[in-house]
Amino acid sequence: MSALAIANAAYVAAALLFIMSLAGLSKHETGRTGVRYGIAGMAIAIAATVWLSLSGEWSDSTYLGIGLLVAALIVGAVIGLWRAKVVAMTGMPELIALFHSFVGLTAVLVGWNGALHAKELSPDLAAVHSAEVFIGVFIGAITFTGSIVAYLKLSAKMSSKPLILPGRNFLNLFALIGFVVLTVAYVITPELGLLIAVTVLALALGWHLVASIGGGDMPVVVSMLNSYSGWAAAATGFLLSNNLLIVTGALVGSSGAYLSYIMCRAMNRS
């Protein structure tokens, strides 16, 4: 059995564990079990990814890549454990918002990497690849700045008052129209300037979307950003041809959106 087949089988097992984790987290009685399923699924996913990276042909760049991978795992694990231990339960929403910003930033970086180091593809596949890059960068950039603003508001490092700009809804609408126009242009002619433009546009839109919402509604915003981070992860999965990222991203995106809907109804918000 090839390394890719083993990794794909591990990804399927991890995806099933993530689904079981969501099911467990839906009830207070099974919450701890759900967390354990999630930990097990993530451990399997990381192990499969490391195994896949070690199974290829070895060269000088392979050693460098493995060194960076190990360093990232160690640094990320240490920081994650430290933050999880020192944060109080009342500070959990701001910590989650900060985590979402990392997911968004990752989607932006992966999208840019996919654009700068694109393989030779047929015209049809190249158009699909360009659309994946553009959409992934757009969603990721919105998630990144939106999550940063949510973190700053929840941690009282930024005023919780909503930012009211003249015609703010029209600004958001024009930004979305601009995204559609830029996407079509980039699919036709994938130029670096268009990618820079959509990145700046999405960063500004993410900041404005969350800054214009008051601090009292931040729990709903964090839930919505959770959904955005899921779709950003799914877009990253399409770029990397990683089925696990696509499945888990869709799970997080859909569950986050539904949770936001429930919270809006409970808080009498539109």
Give a label for each model feature:
Residues 30-46, 64-71:
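Loop-to-helix transition at the N-terminal end of transmembrane alpha-helices
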Residues 57, 113-124, 188-193, 220, ...:
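Transmembrane helix-loop junctions at the membrane interface of multipass transporters and ion channels
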Residues 17-32, 77-96, 147-162, 205-218, ...:
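C-terminal ends of transmembrane helices
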Residues 251-270:
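Membrane-interfacial segments at transmembrane helix termini in multi-pass membrane proteins
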Residues 77-82, 101-116, 133-149, 262:
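Mid-bilayer segments of alpha-helical transmembrane spans in multi-pass integral membrane proteins
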Residues 49-66, 70, 81-91, 108-124:
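Transmembrane alpha-helix boundary signature
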Residues 37-50, 97-111, 168-180, 224-237:
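Small-residue-rich segments of transmembrane alpha-helices in multi-pass membrane proteins
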Residues 2-16, 60-76, 129-144, 187-201:
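Structural signature of hydrophobic alpha-helical transmembrane segments
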